[in-house]
Amino acid sequence: MTVTADTTATDRVTPAERIAVRCVDSDVHPVPRRGELVDYIPEPWRSKYFRSHRVGEQIFYDAPDYAHSYAMRVDSFPADGEFACSDPDLALKQLIMEAGSDIAILEPIHGEMRIPEATAAFCTATNLWLANHWLDAHNNWHERWRGSICVAIEDPASAVAEIETWAGHP
């Protein structure tokens, strides 16, 4: 018999003891919900560059000859119409509770901009979004998500600053 935890309950309590780590899923790519990322982009880049582009609203080629799920589980798309892996509760249910992973490494995918400083601003926004929407006390109450950071390799100074900012964060 399989028992699945109700992840929508309000009694999200940090576990009293840690589990033994047997299986780590290192291929989890959380995606922001539509419009969620833009508020995290630092100025002046938010107004100057990203307000003229749709940030976090991905448009994919979806012709009948192309797989709708883009190599993702078809059932990983939430019922509200958002993109796959945009719902931490659904990801917890599928990756941890059902698939049996003990820990999941979150690796948000970010796009490269044509201007290195814009890429750095987008990486900063992605890291802040991940911390606030996946690694926060509400969504990581089970302490099984681990974050990774995005850095702009085109801008080494900002990459170092971003690494130093997030050093020690889960």
Features from the language model and the residues they span:
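Helix-coil boundary/capping segments in enzymes
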Residues: 1-170
